[in-house]
Curated annotation (Swiss-Prot):
This is Ribosome-recycling factor. GO terms for molecular function: ribosomal large subunit binding. It comes from Methylobacillus flagellatus (strain ATCC 51484 / DSM 6875 / VKM B-1610 / KT). Pfam families: RRF (PF01765). Disulfide bonds: none annotated. The lineage of its organism: Bacteria, Pseudomonadati, Pseudomonadota, Betaproteobacteria, Nitrosomonadales. Its main location: cytoplasm. InterPro entries: Ribosome_recyc_fac (IPR002661), Ribosome_recyc_fac_dom (IPR023584), RRF_sf (IPR036191). GO terms for biological process: cytoplasmic translational termination. Transmembrane segments: none annotated. Responsible for the release of ribosomes from messenger RNA at the termination of protein biosynthesis. May increase the efficiency of translation by recycling ribosomes from one round of translation to another.
Amino acid sequence: MIQDVKNTAEQKMQKSIEALKADLSKVRTGRAHTGLLDHVQVEYYGSMVAINQVASVSLGDARTLNVQAYEKNMTPKVEKAIRDADLGLNPATNGDIIRVPMPMLTEERRRDLVKVVRSEAENAKVAIRNVRRDANDALKKLVKDKEISEDDERRAQDEVQKLTDKFVAEIDKLLQTKEAELMAV
């Protein structure tokens, strides 16, 4: 029973970390990376699909992405989707290849992005703490129902707290890494 509560808490905390990683990957730094366009949607024969379904995205260099549509007639639609994705990118078609240069971030924009990243990290910490609270409530219910002793509850709460500390430290590490990426010129 105690192990079930701890396992559930750990799984939920891990999901919070994964969600944070996904959110942080969407925040554009000055460097190009192929995951930057993952959430861009392209109209493909009447339905909206992810860009990686209709084109290959590769790194040209540290500051340029190369996008090549699998079908030549899709090139203009892919370029338009990138331009309309509200990422501040200005793609240019060169034959079949769409080159997407990464513009330099201004100091002000970097600071704004750091604020956004810190906010995302704080939201993840709140989610972790909510999982801890739910786990502790479940443990209290087990004590109330006389399924475990108070000593077992206390030990389990300590273990849940250690899990919480571990995941909060991981969030801090992710935040620090992303801030360093953003502030690197």
